[in-house]
């Protein structure tokens, strides 16, 4: 379980998180949504321990994040940031193997190959990471996170992903979320991601957190949160919310 209690963080006089309290029990995919500048990435950084709030605290398994050692925390949770640029000419395989840093031993070759296959990275193995497209880099970074968390213990695991589909084509967006669901159901993974694509969130997330101006304004199941009234008020866009006939999730359509 991950919990946040009364998180406040300000920068240059502006509150990026404003008294945020949340509890994620686990066993689900959580999507954090909101307009630009709502505080989504700031909240994600606080939930992962990369950013200390001005007040309030985050806990993992009821233990404050600031009481975890860096190594032990890295065995429980892994984080994909929006930008993962590298200055040095590492190969894709070397980047993926960096996920083993918190552990004393390297992956078995078959485990690394399995993870690269899951993330569709096999053909990229010997490429210079810096020469990859944005979408290819996102797939490689996901593979690195899975290498980091692939050990069966400790368990459960948490994946935090900041806009993981921003550069992916539609095939790899679908592949990513199918894989995340598989990890949740089969390997005791928990997923928390920041997204801008409302329909991806509606289709694949179990829980939606809506943010506006540093505050959480809604938190619940997609069909309860992604309503036409709520989204029109939040985004100021002309939209229609329908029901997806395939799975009865909300389907958000931009009006002409």
Swiss-Prot record:
Keywords: ATP-binding, Cell inner membrane, Cell membrane, Membrane, Nucleotide-binding, Translocase, Transport
Class of this enzyme: translocase
Residues reported in the UniProt entry to bind ATP: 34-41
Catalytic activity, EC: 7.6.2.-
Any single GO CC term annotated in Swiss-Prot or TrEMBL for this entry: plasma membrane
Bilayer topology annotation: Peripheral membrane protein
Residues of the ABC transporter domain: 2-238
Stored SMART domains: AAA
UniProt key word Lipid metabolism: no
Places the protein is found: Cell inner membrane
PROSITE patterns hit by this protein: ABC_TRANSPORTER_1, ABC_TRANSPORTER_2, HMUV
GO molecular function: ATP binding; ATP hydrolysis activity
Subunit organization: The complex is composed of two ATP-binding proteins (HmuV), two transmembrane proteins (HmuU) and a solute-binding protein (HmuT).
Family: Belongs to the ABC transporter superfamily. Heme (hemin) importer (TC 3.A.1.14.5) family.
NCBIfam families: PRK13548.1 (NF010068)
Role: Part of the ABC transporter complex HmuTUV involved in hemin import. Responsible for energy coupling to the transport system.
Name assigned to this protein: Hemin import ATP-binding protein HmuV
UniProt source species: Shigella dysenteriae
Gene from which the chain derives: hmuV
